[in-house]
Amino acid sequence: TADGELTLLVRDQSRPNGIALSPDETVLYVANSDADNKVWMAYDLDDSGASNGRVFFDINDQDAPGAADGMKVDRAGHLFATGPGGVWVISPDGVHLGTIMMPEVTANVAWGDDGRTLYMTSSTSLYRIKLTTEGIIPGP
């Protein structure tokens, strides 16, 4: 709240972890890192809080190492989410567009200052890749 009071928004996850906002900040994505329930959730946001919690994308059928973890969005609203095998690219409509395959379990991602370089942390290393899409870089 405006006076600094903590507000509980949802309590329906077993291991919430990474979070990201849609470009218009009306959807909050949350990675559930529970090995028994590997999903990315989506919640609608408005002045009253979060509602309409739903599974945005389910990766429980994936055998590659890794769980739903850190994520970012690009200006088009695509989610770049670390998960089994690497970084999953998912459209705003929940369609898996592809995966940036990684040699190690990937934990988190960040956009570089050019907005087109995606940095990725993994088990023991740091990687980067140049993309054609433009990421959302937090401003002052």
Question: What do these predicted regions represent?
Answer:
Residues 33-35, 84, 123, 131:
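Short loop/turn segments immediately following the C-termini of beta-strands
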Residues 36-40, 87-88, 126-128:
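Structural signal for beta-propeller blades
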Residues 104-106, 115, 122-127, 132-135:
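A short, acidic, flexible beta-alpha connecting loop/helix-capping segment that sits on the rim
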Residues 6-30, 59-84, 103-116:
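Beta-rich, blade/repeat-based domains predominating
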Residues 40-43, 66-69, 83, 92-93:
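Short, well-ordered secondary-structure micro-motifs
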Residues 20-53:
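Glycine- and Gly-Pro-enriched alpha-helical subdomains that act as flexible
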Residues 1-15, 44-64, 88-102:
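Blade-edge beta-strand/turn elements of extracellular beta-propeller
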Residues 42-49, 130-138:
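Short loop/turn segments immediately following beta-strands, especially the blade-tip
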